[in-house]
Amino acid sequence: MEQTFDLPDSTDWLETPLSLVSPLESSLRCQVCKDFFDNPVITSCSHTFCSLCIRRCLSTEGKCPACRSSDQELKLRRNWAVQELVEAFQNARPSMLELARKAANSRLDGGYVTGQPAAKKRKVDQEDGPDASGSEGIRTRSQSRRGNSQAEPVVVDAIEDDQDKEYIPEDGLVACPICGRRMKNEAVFQHLDICTGDPAPLKQASFGSLQPMSPASRKSKDVTDKPPERLPTINYSLLKDNVLRKKLKDLGIPNWGPRPLLQRRHTEWMNLWNANCDSKAPKSKRELLHELAVWERTQGGHAAPSSESSNTVMRKDFDAAAWSNNHGDEFKRLIANARKRKDAVIRTTIPQAAPARDGTSTASAPEQSTEMSTPPEVAERLQTQTVPEGTSVATIAENETGTIQTPNITQVVSSPPE
């Protein structure tokens, strides 16, 4: 058997005569989850969201999803007026939508089916009007008397019974004839000797009226009266792994997994718990643990590690100056290694790149071609020169060295052989 899911949406009103209700319903929905407000809270920038939705956004970005202004969870306040408005609209929505759809269907049916018969009926009524008025004018006395008797409503007098008012349940007690105080039969005569005639109190505690409260009911009453306390935000960089695991264990949530997963789990539990504190009917801890387990199966354990690393750089409390100071030595080491590799590439590629013009120059200067190295001025020029895109360092070093060594090679070639 197939199941059909009817998801309420603000577009349900567009095909009905009450199409103007659509923007009203849209204003009662959260801009994050697109559902009706659940425990609505208002931000410092006067925007309203679900408590859980805005807490998740602030814990991730620290900005309002509507206007992108900075905000904090401590500034959130509950919006009871919107909560009552949403509840009233949700209760009235099914009947309103049903009436609107019936009106739309009747309008379509009335325009094409019952339009002609209605016009005929009006004509017939107009033709039969005089006859009907004439027949109504001739009436006998019996008909008029019968009509008057039918028109007058029948009034039935209610019989009041004094015994019903004075009925008192039998509890084995007798009332004092002077003050009306109820007591046992054998205590009436002793009471008459000392009775002052004062009326009995309205609410008198009898012997069986005081019922002891069970421990379970007393405990449940204390729980309902005392609101749950909110969880404070913590700085995870100040906590070690074992301390963070102990904190999760004290809260009653799982403490397994790597450190990034522990942080995400604690943040989600903090959002669930604090959002539950904003509700008029808070959920139990078991229900919150079930929601955390659903989040664990869908998002928590399956988040990519790269996303966590990007979030740590993009989070609102990221300190760039402290980051550069902590990793400054590593940056210097990487720069020094890059310069060493650059010099090594220049030394290994330049001797092979110098071509021999002819056999005489190669034979006359063997040591000059095999032991050639980068001159100091070439190295300095390479360090200050900007390398164009697509050009290797070896090519630039070859060109610079060829320019400097060209006069020496020309002298060797032009010198006469011995």
UniProtKB/Swiss-Prot annotation:
Gene3D superfamilies assigned to the protein according to its UniProt record, in alphabetical order: Zinc/RING finger domain, C3HC4 (zinc finger) (3.30.40.10)
Molecular function as annotated in GO: single-stranded DNA binding; ubiquitin protein ligase activity; zinc ion binding
UniProt xrefs under InterPro entries: Rad18 (IPR039577), Rad18_fungi (IPR004580), Rad18_UBZ4 (IPR006642), SAP_dom (IPR003034), Znf_RING (IPR001841), Znf_RING/FYVE/PHD (IPR013083), Znf_RING_CS (IPR017907)
Subunit structure: Interacts with E2 UBC2, forming a complex with ubiquitin ligase activity.
GO biological process: postreplication repair; protein monoubiquitination
Known EC number: 2.3.2.27
PROSITE patterns registered for this protein in UniProt: SAP, ZF_RING_1, ZF_RING_2, ZF_UBZ4
Name assigned to this protein: Postreplication repair E3 ubiquitin-protein ligase rad18
Protein's organism: Aspergillus fumigatus (strain ATCC MYA-4609 / CBS 101355 / FGSC A1100 / Af293) (Neosartorya fumigata)
Biased composition (Polar residues): 359-373
Location of the protein in the cell: Nucleus
Domain SAP per the UniProt entry, residue ranges: 236-270
Enzyme class, first EC level, given as a word: transferase
Keyword Signal attributed: no
Pfam family, any one: SAP
One Gene Ontology cellular component: nucleus
Zinc finger (UBZ4-type): 173-200
Function: E3 RING-finger protein, member of the UBC2/RAD6 epistasis group. Associates to the E2 ubiquitin conjugating enzyme UBC2/RAD6 to form the UBC2-RAD18 ubiquitin ligase complex involved in postreplicative repair (PRR) of damaged DNA.
Reaction equation(s) it catalyzes: S-ubiquitinyl-[E2 ubiquitin-conjugating enzyme]-L-cysteine + [acceptor protein]-L-lysine = [E2 ubiquitin-conjugating enzyme]-L-cysteine + N(6)-ubiquitinyl-[acceptor protein]-L-lysine
Family membership noted in the UniProt record: Belongs to the RAD18 family.
Keywords noted in UniProt: DNA damage, DNA repair, DNA-binding, Metal-binding, Nucleus, Transferase, Ubl conjugation pathway, Zinc, Zinc-finger
Stretches with biased composition (Basic and acidic residues): 219-229
Metabolic or biological pathway: Protein modification; protein ubiquitination
Residues noted as binding Zn(2+) in the record, renumbered to the chain: C176, C179, H191, C195
Region (Disordered): 110-153, 206-231, 350-389, 399-418
Keyword Nucleus: yes
Zinc finger motifs (RING-type), residue ranges: 30-68
